[in-house]
């Protein structure tokens, strides 16, 4: 980590330090902004004290980041077009980084101040889109290319549909609990609010088994949040470092000799595959282009040329430190290009399952060179997220716990909301899909209460929906405006 500050230009080192500070601030805000969702149900059902719930949530957020992998992280990195990320000069890269971070932080703090559980994920993704769009307008390039449409479509679909899925699943769980437990003795207890239990039975705490279920489901939400949102923080920091300190982060400089040889072997196998299937792929390309606009730039001969260039670049290389900065840029570009081509090849109609499995594995293997994160990055993101969880959580907790439904949550509603959220976010993290913890859990709470017939507070739902609708466009406009102003300032000075 210390080599980041070894630049001869003191200003550059200071800017890197400031960028790191901004990213960690964003992640800490994410902690107390989003993780409040995980502790709100515990606190308002009196399953644990507020302090215990927050500390426990912070701990499992930390573990979620450490053990969650990197699939979501690089879904965030790839939202920014590669040419913008790799071709920016240092001043433009700094403008891009600070505009993006400032926009996301300002919106997150604003919604937190007004007690609105808005999505940190939406604000980050919106800020990245704003940079890409503004750059396209300034450089008079394609807006479609600036949006990286295939990646953007997948992210948008996940962010839009995940709350709907949360509402439906949570409501269904309430229905199932009522159906299967109606003949059990004391089944009514799970459908009581803490206040009702205190008034009827004189006890403040939930029954033991219900308490354990609430704690475990809350742990699940915290861990899943760390795995998904923590990965976004890792992706954001890698995006920043690739932009302003590319020499050390374009490729994994810590890759072992064995790993590099494995990458080279994978490239060789891909060359053999494409050479062997030349006629089939060229024929299928012509047919596929008639029905699939996304592969209009697919060219078999360009793929072969790219593979040959990669093979040549890696000749006699057993340590990526042997590559100079230009060669590292080229290697990253070649591997990303090849990865996109593999994705397109997989969707050809005459590619059999065995070939698809080979191509998917090959893509995963070559991306290990560029889709990585040093352990110190994972650790500081985990620490920032967990520390953020332990401060500033009260404002959002009040909204989730008291203002969504017309009455306080029952134990069953809390459990169904948390189980839904932990499963949904966990699956999304495993599959590399960035989702919003805030929207999944708040919609799960609403779904549980609607299923129970308790009703919801329309005014609060309107405010949450308004924050949901505004987050993307506002963060897009903010980051785009900041980027434009910063570039003007750089140009004039």
Curated annotation (Swiss-Prot):
GO terms for molecular function: phosphate transmembrane transporter activity; symporter activity. It is found in: Cell membrane. It comes from the Bacteria. One of its GO terms (biological process) is phosphate ion transmembrane transport. GO terms for cellular component: plasma membrane. Coiled coil: none annotated. It holds the Pfam family PHO4. Belongs to the inorganic phosphate transporter (PiT) (TC 2.A.20) family. Pit subfamily. This is Low-affinity inorganic phosphate transporter. The gene is pit.
């Amino acid at each position: 980590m210390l080599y980041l500050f070894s630049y001869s230009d003191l200003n550059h080192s200071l800017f890197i330090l400031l960028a790191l500070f901004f990213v960690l601030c964003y992640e800490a805000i994410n902690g107390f902004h989003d993780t409040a969702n995980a502790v709100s149900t515990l606190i308002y059902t009196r399953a644990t004290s507020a302090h215990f719930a927050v500390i426990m949530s912070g701990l499992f957020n930390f573990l979620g980041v450490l053990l969650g992998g990197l699939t979501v992280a690089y879904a965030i990195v790839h939202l920014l077009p590669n040419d913008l990320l790799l071709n920016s000069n240092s001043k433009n890269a700094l403008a891009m980084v600070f505009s993006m971070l400032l926009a996301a932080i300002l919106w997150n703090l604003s919604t937190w101040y007004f007690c609105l559980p808005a999505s940190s994920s939406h604000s980050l993704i919106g800020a990245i889109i704003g940079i890409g769009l503004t750059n396209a307008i300034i450089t008079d390039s394609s807006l479609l290319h600036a949006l990286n449409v295939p990646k953007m479509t997948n992210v948008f679909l996940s962010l839009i549909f995940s709350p709907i899925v949360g509402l439906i699943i949570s409501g269904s769980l309430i229905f199932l609990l009522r159906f299967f437990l109606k003949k059990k003795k004391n089944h009514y207890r799970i459908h009581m609010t803490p206040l009702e239990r205190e008034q009827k039975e004189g006890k403040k705490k939930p029954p033991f088994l219900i308490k354990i279920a609430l704690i475990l489901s809350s742990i699940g939400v915290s861990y899943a949040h760390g795995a998904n949102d923590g990965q976004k923080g890792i992706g954001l920091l890698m995006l920043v470092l690739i932009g302003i300190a590319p020499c050390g982060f374009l490729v994994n400089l810590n890759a072992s000799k064995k790993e590099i040889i494995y990458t080279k072997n994978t490239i060789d196998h891909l060359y053999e595959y494409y050479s062997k299937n030349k006629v089939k792929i060229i024929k299928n390309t012509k047919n596929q282009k008639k029905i699939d606009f996304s592969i209009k730039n697919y060219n078999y001969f360009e793929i072969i040329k790219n593979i040959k260039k990669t093979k040549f670049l890696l000749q006699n290389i057993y340590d990526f430190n042997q590559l100079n900065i230009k060669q590292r840029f080229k290697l990253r570009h070649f591997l990303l290009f090849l990865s996109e081509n593999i994705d397109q090849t997989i969707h050809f109609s005459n590619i059999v399952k065995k070939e698809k499995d080979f191509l998917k594995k090959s893509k995963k293997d070559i991306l290990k060179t560029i889709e990585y994160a040093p352990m110190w990055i994972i650790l500081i993101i985990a620490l920032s997220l967990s520390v953020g969880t332990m401060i500033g959580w009260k404002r959002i907790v009040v909204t989730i716990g008291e203002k969504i439904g017309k009455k306080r949550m029952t134990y069953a509603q809390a459990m169904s909301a948390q189980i839904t959220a932990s499963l949904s976010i966990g699956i999304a993290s495993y599959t590399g899909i960035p989702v919003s913890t805030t929207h999944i859990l708040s919609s799960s709470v609403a779904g549980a209460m609607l299923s129970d017939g308790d009703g919801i507070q329309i005014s609060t739902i309107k405010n949450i929906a308004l924050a949901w609708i505004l987050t993307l466009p506002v963060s897009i406009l903010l980051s785009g405006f900041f980027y434009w102003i910063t570039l003007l300032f750089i140009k004039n000075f």
